Amino acid sequence: MARILVTGGTGYIGSHTVVELMQKGYDVVIVDNLSNSNVDMLDGVTSIVGQRPPFEQVDCNDAVAMQQVFEKYTDIEAVIHFAASKAVNESVEQPLKYYRNNLLSLITLLEQMQVYNVHHIVFSSSCTVYGQPSEEHLPVDETAPIQMALSPYGNTKQINEEILRDQAYSDANLHATILRYFNPVGAHPSAMIGELPNGVPQNLLPYVTQTAAGLRQQLKVYGNDYNTHDGSCIRDYIYVVDLAKAHVKAVERMLNGEADEQVEVFNLGTGRGLSVLELVNTFMAVNGVDVPYEIVGRREGDIEQVWAKPDKANQKLGWVADTPIEEVLKSAWQWEKKLRSL
């Protein structure tokens, strides 16, 4: 089977994707500098698939180190690029860090791919490129207008998409698949891998699970005066395992020569919007635990409501995110309990 280079492969989505690739029989090599992930994730991956994936502790911005990776693994046929700094709030405080890490890593990768004749890349993008879509663009499909980014993080995703398009235009051999994720949640059903925030969680569900586990006194719900049915923000929460499977489908589509265009874009979501309060209440109901929460003021930069229209991915990738949210929320709690030995 083909070898797939996975940058950021010890991270949350990366580790789940490595599992799906290996279970499909692909050879992988993980590149990660461990700046916002933990090498222990490799133990979890090994427990699930029965084999330890090759791992290189390398910064994707380091051209010499990346060159050595391509020299060592001469059978790489595709790259899945997850490695990035990803905290929206931090990006506002440290924009240069985000522009350096997120732009330079992709540029370095594309340069090495060109040298070593690797022609397929899957890029980890985000629904943040759509900003707050107007009502006529809900649910959001791939033709929705790209809005001005609300953070340097979001801006790096937009710029990287343009870099990929420009590079593909200049290199007829390059094929890129841009995957715009909605809100990844949950953990592998084995509870061997899951979301492991370094420091303060950036996403809602780790806050919920940590509050349920007693690590936090109460959850803050930012705003209950939005123009939604219960006043809280609405998001499209997609199970991380379903999301990981979409990456395998995207790689296969390119390697099989099935792509319609040199650069393809897919929205990855469930097609269903769920409010913050619905998520919290469903979590409590399915897990039989209490999550104390308080309503506080809106958080700057939060989008009111966004959810995907995933028809294109359903049809062209032959993929669907259909794991019930109840199962997803149970998986998140199993992972948290394992982490805390509860």
Label each region the model flagged.
Residues 93, 100, 104-111, 129-183, ...:
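Catalytic helix-loop patch of NAD(P)-dependent Rossmann-fold dehydrogenases
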Residues 77-80, 122:
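N-terminal Rossmann-like NAD(P) cofactor-binding module of classical short-chain dehydrogenase/reductase
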